[in-house]
Swiss-Prot record:
<keyword id="KW-0378">Hydrolase</keyword>
<keyword id="KW-0443">Lipid metabolism</keyword>
<dbReference type="InterPro" id="IPR007431">
    <property type="entry name" value="ACP_PD"/>
</dbReference>
<comment type="function">
    <text>Converts holo-ACP to apo-ACP by hydrolytic cleavage of the phosphopantetheine prosthetic group from ACP.</text>
</comment>
<keyword id="KW-0275">Fatty acid biosynthesis</keyword>
<keyword id="KW-0444">Lipid biosynthesis</keyword>
<keyword id="KW-0276">Fatty acid metabolism</keyword>
<dbReference type="GO" id="GO:0008770">
    <property type="term" value="F:[acyl-carrier-protein] phosphodiesterase activity"/>
</dbReference>
<protein>
    <recommendedName>
        <fullName>Acyl carrier protein phosphodiesterase</fullName>
        <ecNumber>3.1.4.14</ecNumber>
    </recommendedName>
</protein>
<dbReference type="GO" id="GO:0006633">
    <property type="term" value="P:fatty acid biosynthetic process"/>
</dbReference>
<dbReference type="Pfam" id="PF04336">
    <property type="entry name" value="ACP_PD"/>
</dbReference>
<comment type="similarity">
    <text>Belongs to the AcpH family.</text>
</comment>
<dbReference type="InterPro" id="IPR023491">
    <property type="entry name" value="ACP_phosphodiesterase_gpbac"/>
</dbReference>
Length: 193
């Protein structure tokens, strides 16, 4: 899962949106660094990552990537899952529009930015103003996201080429997401993540 799905699952679980979004920018044990509710959000994010990576359907999704891109497929899939969530938001979350959800999330996160790492503050400077989470619904934007990640981290250069697997296997990947994500939603609602 990437930013949007982590925020959505956090909201369903009544977990800290800030903690869930911040988690990738926090190394090691966050205890003592942040208030307990943010620590709980960071820990939920980590559990979601482990759970997602071990799902049989996600393991199946990785098989759609050739050997050249298999190493980066977990990252590519995390971004793709956000694409499918944004694309199917109205179906999956009929009681709240995506713009309304994002406005709420932003209001929960931005007031706390001064107390977060500089890299996280930098991300937030673009995430909201450029409407990244809404634009995840646009497949060309996903290609841009993967290219940008590849440009910033040379060790992940294969991310740019991994978009080919998305184009080639879009429908089966979408079907896998629409099968496993509603289950994760229920688990979040029942605080089983």
């Amino acid at each position: 899962m990437n930013f949007l799905a982590h925020l959505h699952l956090a909201a369903l679980a009544d977990s800290s949106l800030l903690g869930n979004l911040l988690a990738d920018f926090v190394r090691g044990n966050p205890q003592g660094e942040y208030p307990p509710e943010i620590v709980a959000g960071i820990m939920m994010h980590r559990r979601v990552d482990v759970m997602t990576d071990t799902l049989p359907l996600v393991k199946e999704a990785r098989t759609y990537f050739s050997a050249d891109y298999r190493r980066v497929s977990p990252i590519t899939l995390d971004v793709l899952w956000d694409h499918f969530l944004a694309r199917h938001w109205d179906q999956l979350v009929p009681n709240c529009t995506l713009p309304d959800f994002l406005q709420h999330a932003q209001s929960q996160i931005l007031p706390h930015l001064p107390h977060t790492p500089a890299r996280f503050q930098s991300l937030n400077a673009y995430l909201w103003s450029e409407r990244w989470l809404e634009r995840y619904a646009e497949l060309p934007f996903i290609a841009d996201v993967l290219q940008g990640m590849a440009n910033r981290r040379p060790k992940l250069a294969a991310l740019a080429g991994s978009f080919y697997a998305i184009e080639q296997h879009y429908q089966p990947l979408e079907d896998l997401f629409l099968t496993f994500y509603p289950t994760m939603m229920r688990q979040a609602q029942h605080k089983q993540i």
